[in-house]
Each structure stands twice: as C-alpha cells, then as structure tokens.
Swiss-Prot record:
Organism: Homo sapiens (Human)
Lineage per the UniProt record: Eukaryota, Metazoa, Chordata, Craniata, Vertebrata
Superkingdom, taxonomy of origin: Eukaryota
Single GO MF descriptor: bisphosphoglycerate mutase activity
Function: Interconversion of 3- and 2-phosphoglycerate with 2,3-bisphosphoglycerate as the primer of the reaction. Can also catalyze the reaction of EC 5.4.2.4 (synthase), but with a reduced activity.
Modified residues (Phosphotyrosine): Y132, Y133
Protein name in the entry: Phosphoglycerate mutase 2
GO biological process, alphabetically ordered: canonical glycolysis; gluconeogenesis; glycolytic process; Notch signaling pathway; response to mercury ion; spermatogenesis; striated muscle contraction
Gene3D superfamilies: Phosphoglycerate mutase-like
InterPro entries per the UniProt record, alphabetical: His_Pase_superF_clade-1, His_PPase_superfam, PG/BPGM_mutase_AS, Phosphogly_mut1
Alphabetically ordered keywords of this record: Disease variant, Glycogen storage disease, Glycolysis, Hydrolase, Isomerase, Phosphoprotein
Family: Belongs to the phosphoglycerate mutase family. BPG-dependent PGAM subfamily.
Matches recorded under NCBIfam families: pgm_1, PRK14115.1
Catalytic residues (positions): H11, E89
Amino acid sequence: MATHRLVMVRHGESTWNQENRFCGWFDAELSEKGTEEAKRGAKAIKDAKMEFDICYTSVLKRAIRTLWAILDGTDQMWLPVVRTWRLNERHYGGLTGLNKAETAAKHGEEQVKIWRRSFDIPPPPMDEKHPYYNSISKERRYAGLKPGELPTCESLKDTIARALPFWNEEIVPQIKAGKRVLIAAHGNSLRGIVKHLEGMSDQAIMELNLPTGIPIVYELNKELKPTKPMQFLGDEETVRKAMEAVAAQGKAK
C-alpha cells in the first residue's frame, strides 16, 4: 500500500540541449521550447491537483527555472526550496560545450555512447585550459565545497555517489515525516534516485531515458519502495516522443 508520493521532473530543454552540446555543469538557460515544456509540466501537476510541502533542485538555472514555472503554474510559489550542487547534472569534463553529433563523427558513436551512457567510465577531465573551466570550477556558487568535492569530470557512478547521500540524509527524512516532495533536477542526478528506488542494475539505468519537463510520479510504501512503476504526467504521445528524442541525442547526423 502506498503511503508516500514523490514527484520528480527533469528540467525543460536548455539552449545547449537544443544545440546538442554536452552541458553538464555549464549554466545554460532554458530554450523557448524548454520554457514551454516546464509550463506544460506545471499544467499536468495542476490538473492532477498535486500539492507539495518542500522542493529540491540543483544550483543550475535550467532546473531552478523549471521548478519556478511549476510553482508559479500551480500557485505554490511560497513553498520552501532547497538548492544543492549535489543534484547538479553529471559533470561532462572535457566534453563540456562540444556538439554531441560532431563528437560522434570524430570519435565514433560507440565512444560517445560509452561516455554518455556507461556507468563507471568518466569522460576526459576538464583542465584549466578548457574554455569553460573558470566559469565552472572558479564559480563562487561552489566556493563552499570541501577540497576534493569539486569534480573535473564524472561518470554516472560518480554522479550517483554525490547525489545519493543528499537523498538519504536530507530528502528521505522529509518524505518519512509525511512531507510531499517535489524534485526538479537533471537527467543523471534523477537517474541516481530512480536506480536507488527501483533497485535497477547498472546496465538498466544506462538505458533509461528520462524525458524533459514531464513530471514523474512514484507511489512509495513506508520503506520508500515503489508500489507500482513510475508514472508520467502527460498524454502518452508527448511522453513517447520525449523519450525517443532523448535516446537520439548521441547519434551522428
């Protein structure tokens, strides 16, 4: 029997998603389409009459703006919001800023898929000569991180390793206390939570594509195990198209 409900949403399309570039920790804006996706997600939540008590997001504006759109569209702007770097997207290291299709043409689709989808193989690290090094590694929003916490690149395994402690220590107690939680974050940090909730294998989580801007609903029992598969809020066609679009990103044009 379900005793808790959790809602998660991957941010709407960003300008770099639109350009098919590896985004990671670069603070890209939502595209026009991404803004519309966030508003559509808000409408789906409003239509489902869902209310929340506390919200969590990353420190990247594409996720924050998605959350804002949902809170605005559901008239819940007053809710407390916790922002944390631990829910950031996976750090794509030296690939940050590169067009995925061009990278596939240069290195081969298989290598790009390994970098994007392998569980424990990180991309090349971002060094000090990288054009986005200063705007990420020297950014004051990360000034409070302890030595060794700021990544220069991450595998999916690394991303999950820094997201899950926040889930376990901060979010889980709120859910167990009966709070209705909304998380607006990124494809890979959310994958970490999904993998943990569903007990998925490393291989299975690599194949999971979370669509942008479409709310994901979990009904959980008191042990925080799903009582049924994840549900998407939205019409079937919207969900199917979104998941196909995500899967197609790493292919050479």
